[in-house]
Regions:
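Immediate flanking context of iron-sulfur cluster ligation sites
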Residues: 4-14
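Local cysteine-cluster metal-coordination motifs and their immediate loop/turn environment
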Residues: 15-26
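Short amphipathic alpha-helical interaction segments
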Residues: 331-344
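Minor-groove-contacting beta-hairpin "wing" of winged helix-turn-helix DNA-binding domains
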Residues: 357-361
Length: 377
C-alpha cells in the first residue's frame, strides 16, 4: 500500500512588470528579453537544486510577481515543465497565474491553459480610470474588461479579480461601484485589499488625501454585505469566493501547509524550517542555483513559534481554527496556553467558540490586526 504523500505548495516569483505601480513594494521592475532569459536560467537552476519534498505531492502552484503575464509565455511553460518533472502533482492541483490587463492576449492565454494553468488572478484594483491613473496602473478599466473576456474565452473557469479600497480621494460610493461592477461580471473569486502605504514606495513620498479610519471601516463592512448579494462568501479577512472556489493555495498558507518558494524574496516553510530567498536580484542571478548563496534568514521554528503561527494565521480564516487540531499538533489544550487571551476577546464579543472551533466575530475581523498580535507568546 502506497504511503500517503504530504501536501506541498509551490510559489514561483516572476520579478518583471511593465512599470512599477506607485504603491508596490515587491521585488519587481521592468526587464529586457536578455534579463528575462538570464533569470529563467537561474530560476530553473534553483528548482533543480532544491532537495526538499521528494516524498510530497503538489496540491497548488502560484506564479506571482511582478507580473508573470508580462514575460514571454514560453518562460512560464518551461518553468511548469521543470516543476512537473521534479515533483509529484495531485490530479486536481490548483495552478494560478497572476496577470495584469494590458499584458494578456489570446495566444498567451491558450499557452497558459495548455501548460496546465487552471486559475488566473487579474489585477483590476478599481473600475474608475482616474483611480487607476493615481495608482500608476498601466491599464484602463476597459482594458481590464477585455482581458477578463479573453481569459473566459480561453477556458479559464476560475478567475480571481483584485480590488483595492482606501485609495486616495476614493469615496464610499466609488468603492461600492467598483465592487458591484466587478461582482456583476461574475468572477469566481474577489480579493479586496485595503491600500497600505509602504515605506520606500512613490506613495510614501506624497501627501495623499486618504479616507479616514471610520470611512475605511465602513468600506470594509460594506464589502462583505455587497458581495454576499452576488453569492460570494467571505472565507478570509480580504478574500471572497463563490462556493467551491476559495483559493486553495492561500488556505494552505493559513493552515501552515509545507510550501517552497522559488525566485528572489520568495519565502519557504518545510516542516519546522523556514527561510527566505535573497531579495537582491543580481546576487540571485550570480548564485545560479547555489542554495547556500540564495537562502537567507534560515531558522528552525520552536514549538512556541509554530503555536503562534497556527493561531495568527488560522484566525485569518472566517472558519477559524480547530481546538482539537491544536491539541493534536502541540500536545496541549488550547485554553491552557491561550486561556487569558481567549477569555478577553470572547468577553468583548470579538472572538467566539462554537462546535470545537475558535473564530473571529464580524466585529473581531474589523480589528483583526490588534487581536492577532495578542497571540504572540
Amino acid at each position: 500500500m502506497n504511503k500517503k504523500r504530504k501536501p506541498l505548495e509551490l510559489y514561483v516569483h516572476i520579478p518583471f512588470c511593465i512599470r512599477k505601480c506607485a504603491y508596490c513594494d515587491f521585488v519587481s521592475g521592468p526587464g529586457t528579453k536578455a534579463m528575462q532569459k538570464e533569470y529563467e536560467e537561474a530560476l530553473l537552476a534553483e528548482i533543480d537544486a532544491a532537495e526538499e519534498a521528494a516524498e510530497s505531492e503538489v496540491i497548488s502552484v502560484f506564479f506571482g510577481g511582478g507580473t508573470p503575464s508580462a514575460v514571454d509565455a514560453g518562460m512560464l511553460v518551461r518553468v511548469m515543465e521543470k516543476l512537473r518533472s521534479k515533483y509529484v502533482f495531485s490530479e486536481d492541483a490548483e495552478i494560478t497565474l497572476e496577470a495584469n490587463p494590458g499584458t494578456l492576449d489570446e495566444e498567451k492565454l491558450k499557452c497558459y491553459r495548455k501548460s496546465g494553468f487552471n486559475r488566473i488572478s487579474i489585477g483590476c484594483q478599481s473600475v474608475h480610470d482616474e483611480e487607476l491613473k493615481r495608482l500608476g496602473r498601466i491599464h484602463t478599466f476597459a482594458e481590464f474588461q477585455e482581458s477578463f473576456a479573453l481569459a473566459r474565452d480561453a477556458g479559464f473557469a476560475n478567475i480571481n479579480v483584485d480590488l483595492m479600497s482606501g485609495l486616495p480621494e476614493q469615496s464610499e460610493e466609488k468603492w461600492e461601484e467598483s465592487l458591484r461592477t466587478i461582482a456583476e461580471l461574475s468572477p469566481e473569486h474577489i480579493s479586496a485589499y485595503s491600500l497600505i502605504v509602504e515605506p520606500g514606495t512613490p506613495f510614501a513620498e506624497q501627501k495623499l488625501d486618504l479616507p479616514d479610519e471610520d470611512t475605511e471601516r465602513e468600506m470594509y463592512a460594506r464589502t462583505a454585505e455587497i458581495l454576499a448579494e452576488y453569492g460570494f462568501f467571505q472565507y478570509e479577512i480580504s478574500n471572497y469566493a463563490k462556493p467551491g472556489f476559495a483559493c486553495r493555495h492561500n488556505i494552505g498558507y493559513w493552515k501552515r501547509t509545507d510550501y517552497l518558494g522559488f525566485g528572489p524574496s520568495a519565502a519557504s516553510l518545510f516542516g519546522n524550517c523556514r527561510w527566505t530567498n535573497t531579495a537582491d536580484r543580481s546576487l540571485y542571478l550570480k548564485a545560479c542555483g547555489a542554495l547556500e548563496k540564495i537562502r537567507e534568514d534560515e531558522e528552525i521554528l520552536s514549538r512556541q513559534d509554530a503555536m503562534e503561527e497556527f493561531m495568527f494565521l488560522g484566525l485569518r480564516m472566517t472558519q477559524g481554527i480547530s481546538t482539537a487540531e491544536f491539541e493534536e499538533q502541540f500536545g496541549k489544550e488550547i485554553h491552557a496556553v491561550y486561556g487569558g487571551v481567549l477569555k478577553k476577546y470572547e468577553a468583548m464579543h470579538l472572538l467566539q467558540e462554537h462546535s470545537g472551533r475558535l473564530a473571529l466575530t464580524r466585529d473581531g475581523i474589523s480589528v483583526s490586526n490588534v487581536i492577532l498580535a495578542d497571540f504572540l507568546l
